[in-house]
């Protein structure tokens, strides 16, 4: 009986350790990064992605993102302890020690680089590694605690997965790859500033100079409005002049963009309304995921066949 209880406690402890390391990686953030990788890969491969390459690239991207987020947790453990919503994370709660977390992060980065180098190419691996370095040194260490533009410049780190996906397929970076990077980069400020409006008091408490804290809600929603307009406009450049995507993607991008603009407009006229900020924040996630899904669907040979058949049918009718 005693041995059974001891075994159960050991099992529970092991599960708790696994859960703590899993939480270090901030797993809810990673799918949003991977969907941009997928969208980029499908366009680059013209709708015919090698399943093995897709799996490897997604795995490498997951490991790279997990490494960056783990180091972010190490660096931010002091401010995480001060905020109620983050106080129970593994680092501030003492569930994981700094040394162990750092070893874990390095192991993830090495595994990501190795996997992408061996099964994709060196360019994809180097881009993933640069994403980790940029996120840790430029955003976490330098910008986050010192500049209201932390999210703007730091958004480059979150846009790098799109480049990784394109590089994994082609071994190069075209104008289309850089445009997808730019779309994610421009989308980041409206997304994160909407969140910052919701939790402004938390950031103020720990001295993080997020735009709503330093310049106020009114100035922030104006910036959100401008970036939303530019983001939506940028999404259409994949259709013209780059011709990387077609009519199906265009219809999806216009529809999603119209809703994005409407929600941003509502926030512009209700800068103090947190439910409106929350609504925009949640929609921005759906917007990016559905936009990238639109890239995938539009690139498929079946989609091209159906569109061409529909156009031919219209010509016959006319």
From Swiss-Prot:
GO CC annotation, single: plasma membrane
Residue stretches spanning the membrane: 29-49, 51-71, 102-122, 123-143, 151-171, 179-199, 219-239, 241-261, 280-300
InterPro entries hit by this protein: Protohaem_IX_farnesylTrfase (IPR006369), UbiA_prenyltransferase (IPR000537), UbiA_prenylTrfase_CS (IPR030470), UbiA_sf (IPR044878)
MF terms (GO), sorted A to Z: protoheme IX farnesyltransferase activity
Pathway: Porphyrin-containing compound metabolism; heme O biosynthesis; heme O from protoheme: step 1/1
Gene Ontology process terms (BP): heme O biosynthetic process
Membrane topology: Multi-pass membrane protein
Compartment(s): Cell inner membrane
Major site of localization recorded for this protein: membrane
Keywords from the named record: Cell inner membrane, Cell membrane, Heme biosynthesis, Membrane, Transferase, Transmembrane, Transmembrane helix
EC number: 2.5.1.141
Catalytic activity: heme b + (2E,6E)-farnesyl diphosphate + H2O = Fe(II)-heme o + diphosphate
Pfam families assigned to the protein according to its UniProt record, in alphabetical order: UbiA (PF01040)
Miscellaneous comment in the UniProt entry for this protein: Carbon 2 of the heme B porphyrin ring is defined according to the Fischer nomenclature.
Primary role: Converts heme B (protoheme IX) to heme O by substitution of the vinyl group on carbon 2 of heme B porphyrin ring with a hydroxyethyl farnesyl side group.
Family statement: Belongs to the UbiA prenyltransferase family. Protoheme IX farnesyltransferase subfamily.
PANTHER family registered for this protein in UniProt: 4-HYDROXYBENZOATE SOLANESYLTRANSFERASE, PROTOHEME IX FARNESYLTRANSFERASE, MITOCHONDRIAL
UniProt protein name: Protoheme IX farnesyltransferase
């Amino acid at each position: 009986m005693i041995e059974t209880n001891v075994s159960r406690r050991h099992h529970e402890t092991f599960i708790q350790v696994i859960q703590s390391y899993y939480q270090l990686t901030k797993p809810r953030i990673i799918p949003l990064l991977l969907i941009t990788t997928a969208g980029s890969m499908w366009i680059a491969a013209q709708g015919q992605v090698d399943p093995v390459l897709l799996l490897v690239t997604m795995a490498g991207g997951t490991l790279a993102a997990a490494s960056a987020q783990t180091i972010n947790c190490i660096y931010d453990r002091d401010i995480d302890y001060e905020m109620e919503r983050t106080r129970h994370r593994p680092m501030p709660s003492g569930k994981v020690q700094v040394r162990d977390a750092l070893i874990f992060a390095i192991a993830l980065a090495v595994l990501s680089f190795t996997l992408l180098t061996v099964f994709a190419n060196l360019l994809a691996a180097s881009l993933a590694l640069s994403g980790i370095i940029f996120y840790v040194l430029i955003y976490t260490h330098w910008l986050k605690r010192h500049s209201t533009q932390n999210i703007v410049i730091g958004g480059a780190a979150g846009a790098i997965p799109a480049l990784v996906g394109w590089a994994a397929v082609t071994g190069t970076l075209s104008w289309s790859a850089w445009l997808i990077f730019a779309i994610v980069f421009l989308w980041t400020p409206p997304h994160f500033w909407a969140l910052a409006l919701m939790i402004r008091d938390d950031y103020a408490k720990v001295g993080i100079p997020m735009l709503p804290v330093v310049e106020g809600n009114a100035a922030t929603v104006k910036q959100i409005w401008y970036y939303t307009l530019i983001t939506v406009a940028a999404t259409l450049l994949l259709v013209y002049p780059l011709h990387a995507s077609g009519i199906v993607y265009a219809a999806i991008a216009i529809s999603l963009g119209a809703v994005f603009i409407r929600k941003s407009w509502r926030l512009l006229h209700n800068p103090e309304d947190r439910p409106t900020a929350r609504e925009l924040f949640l929609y921005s996630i759906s917007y990016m995921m559905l936009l990238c899904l639109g890239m995938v669907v539009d690139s498929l040979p079946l989609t091209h066949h159906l569109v061409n058949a529909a156009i031919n049918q219209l010509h016959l009718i006319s």
